[in-house]
Amino acid sequence: MASGGGSLGLIVFLLLLQPKPCEAWAAASVLSTSGFPSGFSEAPRDNPPPPTRVRMSKATTRSPFMNFSLVCGQPFMKIMGGVDAEEGKWPWQVSVRVRHMHVCGGSLINSQWVLTAAHCIYSRIQYNVKVGDRSVYRQNTSLVIPIKTIFVHPKFSTTIVVKNDIALLKLQHPVNFTTNIYPVCIPSESFPVKAGTKCWVTGWGKLVPGAPDVPTEILQEVDQNVILYEECNEMLKKATSSSVDLVKRGMVCGYKERGKDACQGDSGGPMSCEFENKWVQVGVVSWGISCGRKGYPGVYTDVAFYSKWLIAVVNQADCLHPVVFLVLLLCSLTS
């Protein structure tokens, strides 16, 4: 009927007049459409440094965490020392996979989003993630979920040095939180992690450099101390006799004694630090020179530095679909 069509047209017109929360963010992210170096053996760095325990300044009254999830950073298991991670210690840790093959780590930041490194992503490849199990092979408590959409930072580059090495993966469907599946907290831009903070890096990467490109079966954990990018840059320039700045803003480093580091296969995984009884992801495993070499810190993407980009991508992706769904629903009701 003509009157029904007119009403629908008016409703759609009014919807289009409404300000869209995502519009301001539309240029903040890009869908991954071009190839990037990735994979278990090809990651530019797959050799990042371990984390440290977060110490934060309390001068600000703003929340130190971004609102990606109503709950985050409080696993049911307590974190303790060791090499193999106990079941449920790091419930935000995920394995980013191609078919059944582990290629990189990642972290669950809410029920439908995973944070990883941009260098882990190739275009035109179907990825999935495995969540909920410390074993990279077994599926006792785990789920394998296809990736719906991939967002790589638009300024990601591997020219001279790796820059803007961060990406977001939207899952095909949300997961339910359990003792083995739980998101990590994401720091706000004002989150001031201090040098020397003790954090932990986790992953299924190589235990020793030069080992076969096969992931370790059981999730590994290693503690590291945070080094801010200025000091880290000087350390790596000295170690490599380079005059080029290798570590810049947007990066953070981790270092402990020789032999304690991330390695190939750990890329994209989290550097997690405890703050006020919550675990916050300070870094994303990005790159390094060899693994666990004395005087060579591992380099991570600084998550707090990119927090606005992260929230922009999630807002844009999550607000687009409800409007489309509403218009389609109205069409079906009036047809």
Curated annotation (Swiss-Prot):
Membrane spanning residue stretches: none
Gene Ontology terms: biological process: germ cell development; proteolysis; spermatogenesis
SUPFAM superfamilies named in the record: Trypsin-like serine proteases
Mode of membrane association: Lipid-anchor; GPI-anchor
Tissue localization of expression: Testis-specific. Mainly detected in round spermatids at all the eminiferous epithelial stages (at protein level).
GO CC annotations, alphabetized: cytoplasm; plasma membrane; side of membrane
Compartments, as annotated in UniProt: Cytoplasm; Cell membrane
Function: Plays a role in spermatogenesis. Involved in germ cell survival during meiosis. Lacks protease activity in vitro.
InterPro entries: Peptidase_S1_PA, Peptidase_S1_PA_chymotrypsin, Peptidase_S1A, Trypsin_dom, TRYPSIN_HIS, TRYPSIN_SER
Keywords: Cell membrane, Cytoplasm, Differentiation, Disulfide bond, Glycoprotein, GPI-anchor, Hydrolase, Lipoprotein, Membrane, Protease, Serine protease, Signal, Spermatogenesis
Annotated signal peptide: 1-24
Top-rank taxon: Eukaryota
EC number annotated for this UniProt entry: 3.4.21.-
Disulfides per UniProt: C104-C120, C199-C273, C232-C253, C263-C291
Top EC class of this enzyme: hydrolase
The protein, known as: Serine protease 42
SMART domains: Tryp_SPc (SM00020)
Source organism per UniProt: Mus musculus
Major subcellular site: cytoplasm
Sites carrying sugar chains: N67, N140, N176
Coiled coil spans: none
Any single Pfam family the record assigns to this protein: Trypsin
Domain Peptidase S1 span(s) in chain numbering: 79-315
Active site: H119 (charge relay system), D165 (charge relay system), S267 (charge relay system)
GO molecular function, one term: serine-type endopeptidase activity
Highest classification ranks of the organism: Eukaryota, Metazoa, Chordata, Craniata, Vertebrata
Family: Belongs to the peptidase S1 family.
